[in-house]
């Protein structure tokens, strides 16, 4: 995905980064069989949910105005979402 440059305030960046970490947590929680979150979903529904979240994370990361944020948890969640097969 190519970088997109946008004009955002530092507060907007902080809010989006936190939302992205929350999205990574959603992916991790849905894919964790020991976690009750998402256990009411079928495997196909789980896949759709994690891929939707991964798309949001990829979009956010592609914005070109990030500073020194650590994207390792986000990258790991995206990789896990893409690897999940029902």
Regions picked out by a protein language model, each given a short descriptive name:
Residues 1-86:
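Beta-rich interaction/scaffold domains
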